[in-house]
Amino acid sequence: MRQYEVMIIVDPSQDERTVAPSLDKYLNIVREEKGSVDKVDVWGKRRFEYPIQKKEEGVYIVLDLTCESDTVRELDRVLNLNDNVLRTKVLRKDK
């Protein structure tokens, strides 16, 4: 298993306190595949350098995961199907 860092930018209309609990159903994808969610860090609302989907700001969330590559690929796919998710970025951490 490898370690990944996933950054998610969510629509700013969502309340920052409800973002982490609503992510739980997506994080179950990792848990069901014998992976682990090491850290969930909600950075809060931040302004963009340029508009993304006609939005000027978004709620940033950073996840640290340990899982297989297929699992993180599926998580990214499912997150991008959600209309509240503006953008995702998956990075594999170096050893």
From Swiss-Prot:
It comes from the Bacteria. Keywords: Ribonucleoprotein, Ribosomal protein, RNA-binding, rRNA-binding. GO terms for molecular function: small ribosomal subunit rRNA binding; structural constituent of ribosome. The keyword Chloroplast does not apply. InterPro entries: Ribosomal_bS6, Ribosomal_bS6_sf, Ribosomal_S6_plastid/chlpt, Transl_elong_EF1B/ribsomal_bS6. GO terms for biological process: translation. One of its GO terms (cellular component) is cytoplasm. Disulfide bonds: none annotated. Pfam families: Ribosomal_S6 (PF01250). Binds together with bS18 to 16S ribosomal RNA. Belongs to the bacterial ribosomal protein bS6 family. NCBIfam families: S6. HAMAP family: Ribosomal_bS6. This is Small ribosomal subunit protein bS6. It comes from Corynebacterium urealyticum (strain ATCC 43042 / DSM 7109). The gene is rpsF.
